[in-house]
């Protein structure tokens, strides 16, 4: 029994050290997975890596680390405090990833919901822990992408936890996300003045357009390449958004807002909603 446990520990350690081609990120993933398992034990159903690290187009200078934990039941107040403390310790020890780790903790019973559940779930992002974060249109989009590209760090394949997702529903969710999440940003001058947000907006608009028009949810890299070829008038703006890194400036506020209006026109033409 002790020998089998030792083999399992060695195999898991080797696997975590080989999840991505970035040793520093593998160390972060190991610390998170070990910490969550230590705190929650058998309450953990699965731990998953998603986002650009799973798609294969991660850019260290600007990309985030996207994680999801699936739990048996909701977390208690003590567990919530422990999870928050874990994330704060991780970002203090790895300051290069401060404000660049996003992680949700979803009870297993909510995973069967195709539409955003009314019940909120804990979420860590931008250096802040939200014990009750509501799910939005990103719910079905993220689950679809996890079903196609997600990497299980612990537990079963992600597809075993969710019902099949229809691509039409993903296209509709992406269109709704455009109008509910992004269109209001046109009037938010302070938000648009932020270089990071300008880049983030432009690249997300490329993904929305690619998903809605092509019916193919994809990475920002793939969507950006498609958008530059399909809408060459926006090539320069998209390339600048792709090249942006933390610490650099992107002074394209007016152009980003114009691209947002352009995206609205293209999505409206589909009559998807």
State each model region's role:
Residues 7, 17-18, 85-195, 202, ...:
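Conserved NTP/Mg2+-binding pocket subregion across the NTase superfamily
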Residues 7-48, 78-80, 273:
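Helical scaffold of the NTase/Pol beta-like nucleotidyltransferase catalytic core
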Residues 14-19, 69, 242-248:
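Glycine- and acidic
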Residues 49-51, 55-87, 100-107:
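Catalytic metal-binding acidic patch
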Residues 180-240:
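Extended, basic/helix-rich recognition subdomains
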Residues 216-273:
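Structured mid-to-C-terminal alpha-helical surface segments
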């Amino acid at each position: 029994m002790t020998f089998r446990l030792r083999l399992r520990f060695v195999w898991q350690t080797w696997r975590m050290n080989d999840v991505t081609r970035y040793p520093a990120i593998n160390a972060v993933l190991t610390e998170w997975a070990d910490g969550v398992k230590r705190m929650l034990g058998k309450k953990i159903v699965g731990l998953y890596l998603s986002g650009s690290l799973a798609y294969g187009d991660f850019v260290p200078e600007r990309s985030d680390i996207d994680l999801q934990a699936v739990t048996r039941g909701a977390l208690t107040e003590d567990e919530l405090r422990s999870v928050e403390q874990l994330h704060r310790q991780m970002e203090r020890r790895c300051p290069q990833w401060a404000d660049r780790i996003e992680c949700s903790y979803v009870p297993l019973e909510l995973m069967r919901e195709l539409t955003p559940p009314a019940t909120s779930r804990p979420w860590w992002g931008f250096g802040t822990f939200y014990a009750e974060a509501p799910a939005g249109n990103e719910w079905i989009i993220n689950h679809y992408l996890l079903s196609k590209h997600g990497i299980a760090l612990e537990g079963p394949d992600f597809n075993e936890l969710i019902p099949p997702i229809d691509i039409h529903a993903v296209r509709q969710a992406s269109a709704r996300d455009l109008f509910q999440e992004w269109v209001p940003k046109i009037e938010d001058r302070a938000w648009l003045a932020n270089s990071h947000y300008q880049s983030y907006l432009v690249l997300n608009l490329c993904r929305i357009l690619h998903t809605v028009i092509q019916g193919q949810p994809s990475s920002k890299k793939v969507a950006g390449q498609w958008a530059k070829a399909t809408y060459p008038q926006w090539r320069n703006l998209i390339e600048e958004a792709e090249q942006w890194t933390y610490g650099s400036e992107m002074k394209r506020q007016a152009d980003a807002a114009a691209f947002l209006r352009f995206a609205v026109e293209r999505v409206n033409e589909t009559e998807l909603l």
